[in-house]
């Protein structure tokens, strides 16, 4: 069944087709079938929040955050597959590729397609694309996308005036040909990243704010990102090394900053030989339509940096950057820089390309990145470069390359201020390491090992991964020690009483939820683990909900910060989960009691609630409602 039929229904599809045939020019029905590579990208931006209270007011409003995160959009693009040049050893677009470089879905539609077909960045597909001639009303489409996303996740996507990218081609069908392998989950061997940072220069557009700032030099960016005496404490190397316990390396030998990289403001890519097509010139001057097909008899793709920020412009940036880097190698291949750069360019496993764009570029977002990285290269873009938050923004986008989703709290997409994937606005120059679910997701951390096991061992952490099977004889497990997250990598307790066991394929009750309990300490050492954590979460046990697993092909799960204590929302040292109805011995609730906290650990008791609200079984010798009282000791039984 085609994607169009799935989305709109057979009757609607036939009606739309009939209307198109009646009214559209001949080229509106042009279809392209070929082999392409899929990329899912995530964007966010900063905005100024509204005043704390509207004017006029006699006293100034209270101090507030100067900027807040805004969700921008998720975008699904089809690009040419990457291959390796047999002469140079560099990655390149497959010269046999005949698919356009195009956005095919945005917003909720992009997520739906990705999740339904389990698409990972770098997957190679056989696709049939139909050119889109008339874009939908962008404000209506954006509203529908926001509504669908809110319904799917339960989170509020803060309103934004930015339009969703308009798909340039409609995805009619797809079939997976080659799936990329998972590469971003730690499996016992440190991941040594190769990274090139490109400082981009769009001064050819002759517009203010489109040149690379004179103060933004390769030397400055290198100093900002690598460990050194003059580096900010949240430099990228320190971020990766500290938060991953050195499981991910940002080695100076595999890192370079290049630029400024000049890019022609307007240009095009010569098409390969193919049957003639009706002409489709670039839009007229002043046109607001940014995303009609860029393919015609003159160009296989064209771009205009002064007006647009589509897949075509992004590919123009990347082509110019790669050509710039390769030219440096060609000029002096035997120099230390030439050899180092050539080695990075020829690396075939998840090379990171970070693009620092001029602040005036025609993009609505502040940061934009590939979500997951399995192809030879993956990209992260930042618009502008601020000494205040540049490293936080870049780390956020870099962790999208790792496959991490946003860290939320309740209905707020970026509401978790304990994770760089959430609200990092108050982290300043400190490190804000990922929360427990995200640390587990990429293999940087795991549940606690059995007492007595030394830190940083290969033990799996299965001892602290609790299911219904752990509570069969006694509902209480007392005296569990949760180490501070920065002290060792087995540092969380995971509880899912709706699961029979942790075994693959084990029975689970409908609605089963895993809860992650972790302990965070604000590090007062500059550049130390969690040195960017706010005092709100210092010496706190955090409770997150997360049902994801360690797989890059399991989509749709985001961590959700529920509460933190000892002083939980219950105004006590106790947190209680919602109750899940019993089914085949699975389900119930979870109660967490914080007994003590220190500078290095928290001690907690955990109980499985089998009777909701009050004790009903008064002669079984079990504290079924987890109030600490059994049978006749419980007032419920008196």
UniProtKB/Swiss-Prot annotation:
Coiled-coil residue spans: none
Reactions mediated catalytically: Cleavage of the proline- and hydroxyproline-rich proteins of the Chlamydomonas cell wall. Also cleaves azocasein, gelatin and Leu-Trp-Met-|-Arg-Phe-Ala
Residues annotated for Zn(2+) binding in this entry: 97, 396, 400, 406
Enzyme class: hydrolase
Subcellular location: Periplasm; Secreted, Cell wall
Protein family (similarity comment): Belongs to the peptidase M11 family.
Record-given protein name: Autolysin
